[in-house]
Curated annotation (Swiss-Prot):
Together with its co-chaperonin GroES, plays an essential role in assisting protein folding. The GroEL-GroES system forms a nano-cage that allows encapsulation of the non-native substrate proteins and provides a physical environment optimized to promote and accelerate protein folding. Forms a cylinder of 14 subunits composed of two heptameric rings stacked back-to-back. Interacts with the co-chaperonin GroES. It catalyses: ATP + H2O + a folded polypeptide = ADP + phosphate + an unfolded polypeptide. Belongs to the chaperonin (HSP60) family. ATP binds at residues 30-33, 51, 87-91, 415, 479-481, 495. Pfam families: Cpn60_TCP1. This is Chaperonin GroEL. Coiled coil: none annotated. It comes from the Bacteria.
């Protein structure tokens, strides 16, 4: 085991502080509408240019082990804020730096770090409550577009596309971000329920030019198991043929004799039919088949439920207005399920989303929810080069997360103004002693820092701007994009309340942890072994030029 280097007290905190400063100083130049770019070298390919705080933070590794510890802790603030709120990473980093910087000075002057932490916690709690009072719900598509625009570094195209996507698939809908083939950034909306399984044989297509199978008013047979034998399916097929309606078969698989018979009947024109594999795997497949059954008003033919395929009747089949099946996807439009049953299914999935601790499961459950409730919107991000594509895709994902946060908890004035506006509530915080009061003072000073930095990045003096904003009321603040003081909500400079809240809570949490650090331990750097002496030339090796 390698020997360790141990540093204590002020020395430990100072070295951690140097790392915090290095990371925060690199990240904070990106803040605001006039934020600067950061160029990041890549080990292969072109360097990346970004204005995304979390992308900058992720790239930073420092040589000094203790400084690196400080930097990594603040990196955690940025990542955590990005994961939960989708934006506010730079704000969180700046707040963490400001809280820690002020706190280190006070601890060095003899204040009790635990009491300072208690003061910080009390102040943050009061501010979070006040942010809730300041927040307003998002009223319309225009406000959603404004949130998206600001989070995407003032790109109105991105803001408008996200707002349009939300209006089309609803607040519960799934919006995914993909890379486009061309230069344009476009929105594609899939209405109804879509899943990523296509037809099992190209002979099922009804439009050979587009290679799709389209059916109006089809019946839908949902079978949990594999179908190989035709005799099991014959009774229900005969009933469907008498009704002269198209049939969609969704099963674990259809192969052998069953598939061949369906294809032959389709080609002869006896039966309009298409067979599709069931989506998902294992337990998720069962759940998705139940979703399809609920949406279409059918039943899952499952031996577990006591229904065998040979006993199935038309009453067990689902109905839909239209179904479109291509090589890779199946879309069910306007299923005939009962609204009460659909509502109950939605309620059940929502409860599962609340209970699950796995991010992957949560994402899959949200996708299922969206497929039942609304639909799926895909934002195809286009750009001229791959470097620009990556940067733009990052911005779209940030903006999308920020708009979701705005819809969830409402909006507050942007540009760092909301936190400054909440400052007055700190007068009512009752600290138990002077050291706790010092913790409250740290927060009072730290919450001005994002506004100061936005102003500084735009080429203004932060302190002057901050004082002017403090004199105003409500949404009055500084619009760094225009250099004007105005009503920020009316001007569209708005932030999601959730972003401000999460940024403040995460920053205070990590800064308090660092403040109460009394000892830091890291591996000692390894001494380089002395280089081996250079080998002298080997004599007598001349004259070998003729060898090939």
């Amino acid at each position: 085991m390698a020997s360790k280097e141990i540093v204590f007290d002020t020395k430990a905190r100072e070295r951690l502080a140097r790392g915090v400063d290095k990371l925060a100083n690199a990240v904070k130049v990106t803040l605001g509408p006039k934020g600067r770019n950061v160029v990041i070298e890549k080990s292969f390919g072109a360097p990346v240019i970004t204005k995304d705080g979390v992308s900058v933070a992720k790239e930073i590794e420092l040589e000094d082990k203790f400084e690196n510890m400080g930097a990594q802790m603040v990196k955690e603030v940025a990542s955590k804020t990005s994961d939960i709120a989708g934006d506010g990473t730079t704000t969180a980093t700046i707040l963490a730096q400001a809280i820690y910087k002020e706190g280190v000075k006070l601890v060095a002057a003899g204040r009790n770090p635990m009491a300072i932490k208690r003061g910080v916690d009390k102040a943050v709690e009061a501010l979070v409550k006040e942010l809730g009072n300041l927040a307003k719900p998002t009223r319309d598509q225009k406000e959603i577009a404004q949130v998206g625009t600001i989070s995407a570094n003032s790109d109105t195209t991105i803001g408008n596309i996200i707002a349009e996507a939300m209006s089309k698939v609803g607040k519960e809908g799934v919006i995914t971000v993909e890379e486009a083939k061309g230069l344009e950034t476009t929105l594609e909306v899939v209405e109804g329920m879509q899943f990523d399984r296509g037809y099992l044989s190209p002979y099922f297509v009804t439009d050979p030019e587009k290679m799709v199978c389209e059916m109006d008013e089809p019946l839908i047979l949902i079978n949990e198991k594999k179908i190989s034998s035709m005799k099991d399916m014959l009774p229900v097929l005969e009933q469907v043929a008498k009704m002269n309606r198209p049939l969609v078969i969704i099963a674990e698989d259809v192969d052998g004799e069953a598939l061949a018979t369906l294809v032959v009947n389709k080609l002869r024109g006896t039966l309009q039919v298409v067979a599709v594999k069931a989506p998902g795997f294992g337990e998720r497949r069962k759940a998705m088949l139940e979703d399809i059954a609920t949406l279409t008003g059918g039943r899952v033919i499952s031996e577990e439920m006591g229904i065998k395929l040979e006993n199935a009747t038309v009453a067990d089949l689902g109905n839909a207005k239209r179904i479109v099946v291509d090589k890779e996807n199946t879309t069910i439009v306007d299923g005939a399920g009962e609204s009460e049953a659909i509502k109950a299914r939605v309620k059940m999935i929502r409860a599962q989303i609340e209970e699950t601790s796995s991010d992957y499961d949560r994402e899959k459950l949200q996708e299922r929810l969206a497929k039942i409730v609304g639909g799926v919107a895909v934002i195809n991000v286009g750009a001229a080069t791959e470097t620009e594509m990556k940067e733009k895709k990052d911005r779209v994902e940030d903006a999308l997360n920020a708009t979701r946060a705005a819809v969830e908890e409402g909006i507050v004035p942007g540009g760092g103004t909301a936190l400054v506006r909440c400052c007055k509530v700190l007068d009512d915080v009752k600290p138990a002693d002077d050291d706790e009061a010092a913790g409250v003072t740290i927060i009072r000073r730290a919450i001005e820092e994002p506004l100061r930095q936005i102003a500084a990045n735009a080429g203004f003096e932060g302190s002057i701007i901050c004082e002017k904003v403090k004199e105003g009321k409500d949404a009055f603040g500084f619009n760094a994009a225009t250099g004007e003081f105005e009503d920020l909500i009316a001007a569209g400079v708005i932030d999601p309340k959730k972003v401000s809240r999460i940024a403040l809570q995460n920053a205070a949490s990590v800064a308090s942890l660092l403040l109460t650090t009394e000892c830091a331990i890291a591996e000692k750097p390894k001494e380089d072994a002395p280089a081996a002496p250079a080998m002298g030339g080997m004599g007598g090796m001349g004259g070998m030029g003729g060898m090939y």
